[in-house]
């Protein structure tokens, strides 16, 4: 018998030759390069073609990997029909912040300069520009002789002197059913005291609509009360040159930001606002720039751009003026009229118009907005002017200058989804690489595993030949001893070669009386 060599025992089975591996490999062209033939032009051409294909493959794969790490995205647009839609919140503000009749002597004393009704000497600045009736009332209120001022609070002033929805609202219908001022919730914005219809707050359910078109939404008739507008004798942030209302249509999940996002509605017109709900889905970094985390704010629970802006503006004013405006959340003290004039209004104007770095709000990953199309017609017509004047006990001129109708509805009962999607995902990358591997070198993932497996066997064998595995093998042999199988022993044929062994190696007859006289080793194996 030929015993195994020490090298075979230590190093294991020697791996097959490169020619044998190439002939059985699934990698195309490898068998022609590593063949048993002598070096020839054919083998050289095969090697050249293989290396060229491999180079092209590496270039294409590199380009695909670079494209993947550019994180491109595409935008998918779809329209989805719905059986019903949640009607949006509608916030409206009169462009005049304070009613002239509600400004008291104490209000005029504290806020007269802020409203440009008085100068810094508590005097009416330009009596020639004033209406005679208003001037008479104002002169009486501006007489501060023996007047003892009382404490003044801007929040209370805005709430008391702002326009009342119960006086403004002449008619209200939602889906053909009557609604009232009780369906409007008071909300403060930079325009002062405003009102939100269908706010979804205070335990009230969000209203839904079942059809599109006029008559299936909100229709209101308002009196803007121009007779109550403050006289304008100067330019301040609290005075308005316009007449009408400002309207914002928004989701119930975000606060109104009407001074930046609202649209105007003029008296003397019926304005039709056709809406379409749009649901926007943006991708977070690195494919997009949306904010996927919840808002870290003490004032708002859910993140939105308007909530972020209001939160940022509030913090900015508190840091710079040590107070907050009436429409801002929090527990900081309200600004006084002097702080409004000297600090709050200039600081907020600077922040909104010029500072592009302080209040930078990222787009939320999920957003609902409402696309709008506006159209309008003149009211009242000549045929209806007298009727409306009689109905509301006003003159025809008053009706034309103060009455407006606002009609908000869904154009159709569907919503539009605008969704960002990854243009190239990891599955696409692997598919492209796999396809190019199959095209250029005829390889697959299993082919790559074949190459790694063969390389592992070759490296392992060579390391063991250099003695790096022998120490472990010798240590193992010293611990365990040499283990021979029964077949290995029999192949030495001890029964024939050791029959004439000296008697000193035989068993004693009294131990094995019926056994032939053989040596211990022969007896065991035979």
Swiss-Prot record:
Phosphoserine carried by residues: 477, 497
Instruction: Give site residues, Involved in channel desensitization.
Output: 79
Q: How does it sit in the membrane?
A: Multi-pass membrane protein
**Disulfide linkage:** 93-194, 172-179, 290-365, 308-361, 312-359, 321-343, 323-335
Q: Which reaction does it catalyse?
A: Na(+)(in) = Na(+)(out); Li(+)(in) = Li(+)(out); K(+)(in) = K(+)(out)
Q: How the protein is affected by changing residue 105 to Y? A: Activated and inactivated at lower pH
**Listed InterPro entries:** ENaC, ENaC_chordates, ENaC_CS
- What are the transmembrane regions? 50-66, 426-456
Keywords recorded for this protein, A-Z: Calcium, Calcium transport, Cell membrane, Cell projection, Disulfide bond, Glycoprotein, Ion channel, Ion transport, Membrane, Phosphoprotein, Postsynaptic cell membrane, Sodium, Sodium channel, Sodium transport, Synapse, Transmembrane, Transmembrane helix, Transport
* Role: Forms voltage-independent, pH-gated trimeric sodium channels that act as postsynaptic excitatory receptors in the nervous system, playing a crucial role in regulating synaptic plasticity, learning, and memory. Upon extracellular pH drop this channel elicits transient, fast activating, and completely desensitizing inward currents. Displays high selectivity for sodium ions but can also permit the permeation of other cations. Regulates more or less directly intracellular calcium concentration and CaMKII phosphorylation, and thereby the density of dendritic spines.
The record's comment on protein family reads: Belongs to the amiloride-sensitive sodium channel (TC 1.A.6) family. ASIC1 subfamily.
Q: What is this protein called?
A: Acid-sensing ion channel 1
| Species whose genome carries this gene | Rattus norvegicus (Rat)
């Amino acid at each position: 018998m030929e015993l195994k060599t020490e090298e075979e025992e230590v190093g294991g089975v020697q791996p097959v030759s490169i020619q044998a591996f190439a002939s059985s490999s699934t990698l195309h062209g490898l068998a022609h390069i590593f063949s048993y033939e002598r070096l020839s032009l054919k083998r050289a051409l095969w090697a050249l073609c293989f290396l060229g294909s491999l180079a092209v493959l590496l270039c294409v794969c590199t380009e695909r990997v670079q494209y993947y790490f550019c994180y491109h995205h595409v935008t998918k647009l779809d329209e989805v029909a719905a059986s019903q839609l949640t009607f949006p919140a509608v916030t409206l503000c009169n462009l005049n912040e304070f009613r002239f009749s509600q400004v008291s002597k104490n209000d005029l004393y504290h806020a007269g300069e802020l409203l440009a009704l008085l100068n810094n000497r508590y005097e009416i600045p330009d009596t020639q520009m004033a209406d005679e009736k208003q001037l008479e009332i104002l002169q009486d209120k501006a007489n501060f002789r023996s007047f003892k001022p009382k404490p003044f609070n801007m929040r209370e002033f805005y709430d008391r002197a702002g326009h009342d929805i119960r006086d403004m609202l002449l008619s209200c219908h939602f889906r053909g059913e009557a609604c009232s001022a009780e369906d409007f919730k008071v909300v403060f914005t930079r325009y002062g005291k405003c009102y939100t219809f269908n706010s979804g707050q205070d335990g009230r359910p969000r209203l839904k609509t079942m059809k599109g078109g006029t008559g299936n939404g909100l229709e209101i008739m308002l009196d803007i009360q121009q007779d109550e507008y403050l006289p304008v004798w100067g330019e301040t942030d609290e005075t308005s040159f316009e007449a009408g209302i400002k309207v914002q249509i928004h989701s119930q999940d975000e606060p109104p930001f009407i001074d930046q996002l609202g649209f105007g509605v003029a008296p003397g017109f019926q304005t039709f606002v056709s809406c379409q709900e749009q649901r926007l889905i943006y991708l977070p970094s690195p494919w997009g720039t949306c904010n996927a985390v919840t808002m870290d704010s003490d004032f708002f629970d859910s993140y939105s751009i308007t909530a972020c802006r209001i939160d940022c503006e509030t913090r900015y004013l508190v840091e710079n003026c040590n107070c907050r405006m009436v429409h801002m959340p929090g527990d900081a003290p309200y600004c006084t009229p002097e702080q409004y004039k000297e600090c709050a209004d200039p600081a907020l104007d600077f922040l909104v118009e010029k500072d592009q770095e302080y209040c930078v709000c990222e787009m939320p990953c999920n957003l609902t907005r409402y696309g709008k199309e506006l159209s309008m017609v003149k009211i009242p017509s000549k045929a209806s002017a007298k009727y409306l004047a009689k109905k509301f006990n006003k003159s025809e001129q008053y009706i034309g200058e103060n009455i407006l109708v606002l009609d908000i509805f869904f154009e159709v009962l569907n919503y539009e989804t605008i969704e960002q999607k990854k243009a190239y995902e990891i599955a696409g990358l692997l598919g492209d690489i796999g396809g190019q591997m199959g095209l250029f070198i005829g390889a697959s993932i299993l082919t790559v595993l074949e190459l790694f497996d063969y390389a592992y066997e070759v490296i392992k064998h060579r390391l063991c030949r250099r003695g790096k595995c022998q120490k472990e093998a010798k240590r193992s042999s010293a611990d365990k001893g040499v283990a021979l199988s029964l077949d290995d022993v029999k192949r030495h044929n001890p029964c024939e070669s050791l029959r004439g062994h000296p008697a000193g190696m035989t068993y004693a007859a009294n131990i094995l009386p019926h056994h032939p006289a053989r040596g211990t080793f022969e007896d065991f194996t035979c």
